[in-house]
Design a protein with these regions (language model features):
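ATP-dependent adenylation/nucleotidyltransferase module used to activate substrates
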Residues: 1-149
């Protein structure tokens, strides 16, 4: 097992929970990162941490990105009247804030890769992959997508 970690964006849901042991079985030391962009119920953050450690993560980090999401995306989009497909407020941009926090943590830990649990369907995989590639040179692992291919 490598001593430098792979940093996994971790929600505690089914897909990212699968990724922890899957990555460990393939020789990765896994550090999970939950980027809290707001909206968690009391105790939920602790439950996410407990889940990550139960699954074998060597460490779990929670990053508070609520203020960054508000300042960088919500306020400007609401003030600018931005709409997704001219229908509803464009407020699904937390992936970019998550990526920024994930990369900061990965770099501070000397990580060898970053990973996410996005599937091969939908826009999340593109948001994560393109955002990650635009701000760091680390390999991007997507175990769920890879096993679906």
């Amino acid at each position: 097992m490598s001593t430098a970690p792979t940093v996994l964006a971790f929600s505690g849901g089914l897909d990212t929970s699968f990724c922890v042991p899957w990555l460990i079985e393939r020789g990765h030391q896994v550090v999970t990162v939950h980027v809290d962009t707001g909206g968690l119920a009391p105790g939920e953050s602790e439950a996410i941490k407990d889940r990550a450690l139960e699954l074998g993560a060597s460490e779990h980090i929670t990053a508070d990105a609520g203020p960054a999401l508000w300042d960088s995306f919500v306020k400007p989009f609401v003030m600018g009247g931005e709409k997704y497909q001219q229908r509803y407020p464009l407020l699904c941009s937390d992936r970019y804030v998550i990526v920024e926090e994930l990369v900061k943590i990965a770099q501070s830990l000397g990580a060898t890769a970053v990973a996410h649990g996005c599937t091969a369907m939908g826009n999340d995989q593109f948001r994560f992959d393109q955002s990650l590639r635009s701000v760091c040179d680390l390999p991007v692992l997507a175990p769920i997508r890879d096993i679906q291919s």
